[in-house]
Amino acid sequence: HERFRRQRQMCIRDRSYSAIIKTNFGEMKIEFFTEDAPVTVNNFVSLARDGYYDSVIFHRVISGFMIQGGDPSGTGHGDYGKYPGYEFEDELNNQRPYEKGIMAMANRGPNTNGSQFFIMHVDYPLPYSYTIFGQVTEGLEVIDSIAAVQTDAADKPLEDVVIESVEISEN
């Protein structure tokens, strides 16, 4: 996967955006919160349009909590500093609860967003330390199917859960 030296320029316009994330377990439709997290949505949209997430796995799956992906190394460690090659600031304007289907950026501390994201499997009381930028509106059963896979001691699925493609739509 290509590394970038800095975050992409704003490519999104004053519209609403959605995505279809196609996995080997089914499809999920995501509606993005462009007003709450424009920089984060722009980051995800631009990476997805470049095919960045294609063939990347969900490397961390915790049933009763969340599913996490977006690291091309497939480890959860490759994003920080290496992928996508930059970090950007949190957008913590959104005080939505972390409910099933909420999509947020994974990070290793304040202002360390890159390409990794997680999708909530269930409602969970997380601190507002993660930029919430979207919500699954169709395909919640896909989250359940992914969350049901067997994992190792590090929460990595024993069978690959693959993001086959991400299709972005402007509405």
Regions found by a protein language model. Give the residues of each.
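Cyclophilin-type peptidyl-prolyl cis-trans isomerase
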Residues: D71-Y130, Q150-A153, V162-S165
